Regions:
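Short glycine-rich, low-complexity segments
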Residues: 1-29, 72
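Generic serine detector
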Residues: 11, 16, 35, 48-49, ...
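Acidic, low-complexity, intrinsically disordered interaction modules
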Residues: 29-51
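Structured surface patches comprising rigid loops and adjacent beta-strands/short helices at the edges
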Residues: 35, 61-74
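Acidic, aromatic-enriched beta-alpha/helix-loop junctions
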Residues: 44-67
Length: 74
């Protein structure tokens, strides 16, 4: 499934505890757990999470950099 399809399907979601987001961008594979909030708009996917420092950190990824996205059990 390409990133644009995900963006059209949902605009904001959070994974259930038994699922992870597998995201491939810039040639590397990343695995995110249910602690992230995922938002999609017309140009990018946004991943937000509260880290150990207590602050919310946000990563904006333009769709053109995403090679694959998948929700997996685990």
């Amino acid at each position: 499934m390409n990133a644009e399809t995900v963006a059209l399907a949902v605009s904001r979601f959070k994974l259930s505890p038994n699922h992870k987001l597998k995201l491939v961008f810039n040639g590397a594979e990343y695995l995110y757990d249910d602690s992230i909030m995922i938002e999609c708009n017309n140009t990018c996917m946004t991943l937000s999470s509260k880290l150990d420092d207590g602050k919310i950190h946000t990563l904006y990824i333009e769709y053109s950099f995403i090679q694959g996205v998948e929700v997996i059990e685990g």
